[in-house]
Design a protein with these regions (language model features):
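Extended alpha-helical scaffold regions
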Residues: 1-242
Length: 242
């Protein structure tokens, strides 16, 4: 139904935010149709392949329109989709590409001068998501040398008020020239805060010792989860894309 809407009802005269919202709704519908009971080694389902194709269509549209932030959003959606579906042999290349586009590469190279990253709220949000995925990927592959600079940068950003970019509930606007903004729901900031502790716990190498950091981060993360489970917060799922 959503595919027909994209093909037959969305016209070139419609404003950009309408086009992008329709694409994102279609991507979300495809992402939610993956067989959750599938077990064993990864094999791409028709739904996941269609979702990946739909994400790339969104990226192509945003690139043609010179809407850089929407294109960046699509790149991070693709990276997230690959991780979600366990396509680890393609995550590395996608991660490096996204990090380059977000100007994160220089942050992990001591020989290069630091650059300004996350100049807008959306970019800060995307950087935080990409850092979390990067830590998980390099921990998964056993690459401690690449995992640690990313966890350090993640800590720096979370300690430096990067969560403010998420707003009170993770609803942010992607501003478009001469058009109303595209409103999307990203991960709730309280969930990001909790993930910061839990991701840190799995990325540390010191599971034993007098004060093992892995244990400290894990304990703090679990305590936060317990507290958050007792609270309620609004989440408008109709905007939920990342």
């Amino acid at each position: 139904m959503l595919k027909k809407t994209l093909t037959n009802f969305i016209t070139p005269s419609d404003p950009p935010h309408v086009h992008y919202a329709a694409h994102l709704a279609y991507i979300t519908s495809l992402s939610g149709t993956t067989d959750s009971e599938e077990s064993g080694p990864y094999s791409p389902s028709n739904a996941s392949l269609r979702a990946l194709g739909a994400i790339r269509d969104l990226h192509s549209l945003a690139t043609r329109n010179s809407h850089t932030e929407v294109a960046l959003f699509a790149l991070v959606l693709e990276l997230r989709d690959l991780v979600h579906n366990g396509v680890w042999n393609r995550v590395g290349e996608s991660l490096l590409n996204v990090e380059k586009e977000l100007k994160l590469t220089a942050e992990f190279d001591p020989a290069k001068p630091p650059t300004t990253i996350g100049t807008s709220n959306l970019e800060k949000v995307l950087v935080v998501h990409v850092l979390i995925i990067g830590v998980l990927y390099y921990t998964h592959t056993g690459d401690y040398a690449n995992s640690q600079p990313r966890i350090k940068k993640l800590h720096d950003m979370l300690d430096g008020a990067a969560l403010d970019a998420f707003g009170p509930s993770g609803i942010i606007d992607i501003h478009l020239p001469n058009s109303p903004p595209l409103t999307v729901q990203v991960t709730h900031p309280r969930i990001i805060f909790t993930l910061g502790f839990l991701v840190s716990s799995v990325s540390k190498r010191d599971p034993v010792g007098r004060k093992p950091k892995r244990k400290l981060f894990a304990q703090e993360g679990v305590l936060i989860v317990d507290k958050e489970l007792k609270k309620e917060f609004p989440c408008k799922s109709r905007f939920n894309f990342l």
